[in-house]
């Protein structure tokens, strides 16, 4: 299964509560935090919610 490298590139200050919750669920707490997650529909949904705050790359 593919994996996604998710990097937070913008601050969560001034965002809606559901966007802050999605960042926390992804494991991102501050700018330049990086997590690697499985490519699943649940993860894609959280990434879609905060796509303006993160950068996503596919890794092997």
UniProtKB/Swiss-Prot annotation:
Any one GO CC term of the record: cytosolic large ribosomal subunit
Recite the UniProt keywords alphabetically: Ribonucleoprotein, Ribosomal protein
In its UniProt record, a GO molecular function of this protein is: structural constituent of ribosome
Kindly give the Pfam families that the UniProt entry links to this protein: Ribosomal_L30 (PF00327)
Q: Which GO terms describe its biological process?
A: translation
Q: Which Gene3D superfamilies match?
A: Ribosomal protein L30, ferredoxin-like fold domain
Note the HAMAP family from the entry: Ribosomal_uL30_B
Q: Which PANTHER family match?
A: LARGE RIBOSOMAL SUBUNIT PROTEIN UL30M, MITOCHONDRIAL RIBOSOMAL PROTEIN L30
Protein family per UniProt: Belongs to the universal ribosomal protein uL30 family.
What binding partners and quaternary form does the record give? Part of the 50S ribosomal subunit.
**Protein name, entry field:** Large ribosomal subunit protein uL30
């Amino acid at each position: 299964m593919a994996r996604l490298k998710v990097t937070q590139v913008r601050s969560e200050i001034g965002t809606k509560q559901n966007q802050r919750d999605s960042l926390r669920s992804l494991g991102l707490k501050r700018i330049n935090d990086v997590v690697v997650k499985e490519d699943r529909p649940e993860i894609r949904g959280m990434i879609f919610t905060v796509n303006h705050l993160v950068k996503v790359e596919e890794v092997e």
